[in-house]
From Swiss-Prot:
Adapter protein that interacts with EDAR DEATH domain and couples the receptor to EDA signaling pathway during morphogenesis of ectodermal organs. Mediates the activation of NF-kappa-B. Residues 114-190 form the Death domain. Residues 1-36, 52-77 are annotated as: Disordered. One of its GO terms (cellular component) is cytoplasm. Keywords: Cytoplasm, Developmental protein, Differentiation. InterPro entries: DEATH-like_dom_sf, Death_dom, EDARADD. Self-associates and binds to EDAR, TRAF1, TRAF2 and TRAF3. This is Ectodysplasin-A receptor-associated adapter protein. The keyword Transcription does not apply.
């Protein structure tokens, strides 16, 4: 009889205990405040735009990658890959301050002009001279013949007619017609004599 009395006492105790309601329809709305339900639906278009705008900038992502110990492959190029020996904009080095000399500047140096005239005036069957240079820069055959008949140096006449061109363009003609001797003279003048002349005359910069 004792086990039966114990079982009845257990039933009475269970009847007094509150029974948990497991019906989902009877869940209290207050539960969502304590345990928010995760929204698993796809975001709408407006939400996508908001998410995109709220994304951290690339700099933050880069810093995050560096903090994690991984190099950033999309960052700026390494210094070794960048161009070497290139001057920046508004550079104040001596090479950038000097303007490119023109043939007009070359004509003011009588010593240099005499050397070029001696090298380009003579006519040789296998050596390119002033005629080839002048023809390349658009001088007609009649003009070439006319300059040959004049007592003045034809090389000087050719240079006077192209005085607005740069000395660099003249050196390109020397390379084109394999006149390395003339190019060497011009190169030495540009590298050594021209900087002295340009710095010695400040009025050229104004």
């Amino acid at each position: 009889m004792r086990p039966l009395q114990s079982y009845k006492a257990f039933e009475d105790h269970m009847a007094q205990e509150p029974v948990e309601d497991t019906d989902p329809s009877t869940l209290s709305f207050n539960t969502s405040d304590k345990y928010p339900v995760q929204d698993t639906e796809l975001p709408k278009a407006e939400e996508c735009n908001t998410i995109t705008l709220n994304c951290p900038p690339n700099s933050d992502m880069k810093n995050q990658g560096e903090e994690n110990g991984f190099p950033d492959s999309t960052g700026d190029p390494l210094p070794e890959i960048s161009k070497d020996n290139s001057c920046k904009e508004n550079c104040t080095c001596s090479s950038c301050l000097l303007r490119a000399p023109t043939i007009s500047d070359l004509l003011n140096d009588q010593d240099l002009l005499d050397v070029i005239r001696i090298k380009l005036d003579p006519c040789h069957p296998t050596v390119k001279n002033w005629r080839n240079f002048a023809s390349k820069w658009g001088m007609s055959y009649d003009e070439l013949c006319f300059l040959e008949q004049r007592p003045q140096s034809p090389t000087l006449e050719f240079l006077l007619r192209n005085s607005q061109r740069t000395v660099g363009q003249l050196m390109e003609l020397c390379r084109l017609y394999h006149r390395a001797d003339v190019e060497k003279v011009l190169r030495r003048w540009v590298d050594e004599e021209w900087p002295k002349r340009e710095r010695g005359d400040p009025s050229r910069h104004f």
